[in-house]
Amino acid sequence: PDITKCVIVKSPVRINGSTIGAAKNIAVQTGGSLTIQGNGSLLVKDFIRNQTGSANNFVVESDANLLQVNNVSNTGAITVKRDAHKMRYLEYTYWASPVSGQTFKSFSPTTPDARFYQYNESNDLFESIQNPSTNVFGNNKSGTFESAAKGYAIRYYGTSNLFTGTFKGVPNNGDITFPLKFKSGATGQGYGYNMVGNPYPSNIDFYKLHAANSTLIYNTAYFWTNINPNGAMQGSNYPNGALINNYAVLNGTGGVGATSSSAVNGSQTPNQFIKVGQGFIVKAKAAGDLQFTNGDGTNGIRTSNNSGHFFNNRGTTVDRFWLELKTP
């Protein structure tokens, strides 16, 4: 099919990693299923409908891309996966949901309620979305990723070094706005930071995001890496006076990986392409609505370019010989 053809899926269909699929609109009906494998992509001009009643019948695998051109509503839940490699117990990752209605506890069931964090621009600290007086999600009553393009820091409590984040819900589409906060009268370097995220089931281009919002945000994105395994640097305690850095940084001149004083290599270097499910931090120049413009190519920020990295990915251990020198 091409982008001028309406597609109805009545039997299992798989888009392989080397395939770029296209359709005017697509409907998956009873008996059908659609899977986009890693490095594969599907571009849909109009709507997506999963009419099977199960999100498992429409799957976007990790490193696959589902793109849409027009600002139309979708119906029916799908599954979007994001692999996070080399995860360690108690580490954080910055996440954002590419679907609506995803709950925190179904996304990361072993994470305690108090270890889902949002960022508070007004005091430059992370805060739990849990209400400490009731031990429930009092600061986020629905217990869900509240809005498209909002980022969250989530602690990992698993035992494997590979975590597959699984999002289930109606895929986000259309132009999306995120209300940037900026503390009134603030002039210090610690203010204006907002945790946002990629709101789509496709990669996005940060440079295009900045170009569309250059009066509101600086041309810099910060990605948390966990390259420095220091518990005191987690959450609102960062950086705890340390002279090391857990953030990989992208700006207008390129990317810089996070640095470490421990026996690991530096983190991957970010480029302009931000992966599905990725949360990150931007600094606002003023309060206002950050605009995520739908569409691909010149008409929007969405892209199938897979050359970027998903952060949390740490460097590999470096073998070292330690020498002790003594006088005779």
Predicted regions and their residues:
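C-terminus-biased signal that marks the final domain/tail of proteins
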Residues: 265, 269, 273-281
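Surface-exposed intrinsically disordered loops and tails
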Residues: 122-141, 164-180, 184-186, 225-269, ...
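Beta-strand repeat architectures
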Residues: 2-40, 47-58
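Short hydrophobic/aromatic-rich beta-strand motifs
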Residues: 5-9, 26, 150-154, 280-281
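A short, polar beta-strand/turn micro-motif
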Residues: 41-112, 137-222, 274, 281-328
